């Protein structure tokens, strides 16, 4: 089979800038989708508890709660062959499957207000929401 990667080279760093705003597509970040007993999984892997909407996180490893028993772990990887049932949870590698966009600048919260129905001053236990018509985790 032909190697089609030569037809579609990886894009360079993509950024949009405006008054008080910079939106940047970041390079792929290691990610895992975890479903199951989240507290047990977090303890076994040295992760802090998953956070909800607009919560501050500690880099490089953190978890975003998406539903009662589902989270997205950022900054951690599992080999595809080793994925599956691990420490009381179903684990799926997601690196490269979900784009990571950084929205920065003094007008960043105005973008959130226009692109979603969230109250940017509030928080929610789930980081999942519709953002500009696309399912996202903030």
Which stretches of residues belong to each language-model region?
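Basic, glycine/lysine-rich polyanion-binding surfaces/domains
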Residues: 1-138
């Amino acid at each position: 089979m032909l190697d089609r990667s030569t037809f579609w080279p990886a894009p360079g760093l993509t950024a949009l800038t405006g008054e008080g705003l910079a939106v940047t597509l970041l390079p792929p970040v290691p990610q895992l989708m975890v479903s199951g007993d989240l507290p047990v999984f977090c303890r076994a892997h040295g992760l802090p508890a998953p956070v909800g909407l607009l919560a501050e996180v500690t880099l490089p490893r953190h978890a975003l709660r998406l539903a009662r028993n589902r989270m997205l772990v950022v900054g951690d990887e599992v080999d595809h062959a080793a994925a599956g049932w691990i420490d009381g949870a179903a684990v799926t590698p997601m690196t490269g499957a979900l784009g990571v966009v950084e929205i920065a600048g003094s007008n960043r919260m105005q973008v959130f207000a226009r692109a979603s129905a969230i109250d940017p001053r509030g928080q929610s236990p789930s980081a999942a929401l519709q953002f500009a018509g696309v399912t996202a985790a903030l």
